[in-house]
């Protein structure tokens, strides 16, 4: 008796990575279906699958059924509103990590339920493995493309049904495969922008998303380290920790944004040295590779996507108003620990988990 093929749904964006992932799974013998998640459509959308004319290759071997799922309303509520509210709270959001959890994986698993699929797959550059009774997440082998930082919110339920075919490949290898598979997206350029922010201009996006915002917040005070007013800003939501450009102040030394006060509409500045800290508190912790720790533990952590993983001690603090919290103590000072961004914890190449940065703690003065 012929063994039934496992059915897998691949999230298709129209780009080269997801298309190559789908073709690799076809070659590996899976029954492959494509799912294109529509997130920027008008109206409320629906969660009913609809057939799509999308094709990924001119070769009949890779002609797979493709469906669409309109998640526009959910995307507005879960991602776009979050993005807007974080900036209004003087925080710097990371919409991609939220989208992966609440839109991509949730949508793919909903599609899998409707189509009777066993697994879901994406074109992310990361790896999974089942070791010692736990589904684990690892960095992609291509360090320039590794996307494990954006996947720290995933839980055992999602990882147990996830295939990441590109995790062991480099981007040039993926391009070569795309050409060999006859993919229409083989030479397509990558987009580095947030999909709903035209030209990556988040300031203009906020002004359109919050009518009257500019008039309401422009003209607030810019303060130097002593609290003296040295200028007026364009509106606190348009600044982020570590920013230097756009302050419009003339001082003897370069000044950087060190803190933002949304209630007082104030932007605090200081020298570059004021951006450094060795400790930060994080909330909304999610653990993947280990059970939640109850005692201090050693790891490494990234505080932004392109950051290098720095040695640290994770100190659990227990429940707080923003969820379970921990304090991260770095061995060496880190610059611009920005509220709203993610701190993602690693042990070697394995992602242990992560949390949302709530704020840096002042450095202890040298005796």
Curated annotation (Swiss-Prot):
Keywords: ATP-binding, Cytoplasm, Disulfide bond, Nucleotide-binding, RNA-binding, Transferase, tRNA processing, tRNA-binding. It catalyses: S-sulfanyl-L-cysteinyl-[protein] + uridine(34) in tRNA + AH2 + ATP = 2-thiouridine(34) in tRNA + L-cysteinyl-[protein] + A + AMP + diphosphate + H(+). It is found in: Cytoplasm. The active site is at 99 (nucleophile), 195 (cysteine persulfide intermediate). One of its GO terms (biological process) is tRNA wobble position uridine thiolation. GO terms for molecular function: ATP binding; tRNA binding; tRNA-uridine 2-sulfurtransferase activity. Disulfide bonds join 99-195. The record marks 124, 341 as: Interaction with tRNA. CDD domains: MnmA_TRMU-like (cd01998). GO terms for cellular component: cytoplasm. Transmembrane segments: none annotated. Pfam families: tRNA_Me_trans (PF03054), tRNA_Me_trans_C (PF20258), tRNA_Me_trans_M (PF20259). ATP binds at residues 11-18, 37, 123. Its EC number is 2.8.1.13. Catalyzes the 2-thiolation of uridine at the wobble position (U34) of tRNA, leading to the formation of s(2)U34. Belongs to the MnmA/TRMU family. This is tRNA-specific 2-thiouridylase MnmA.
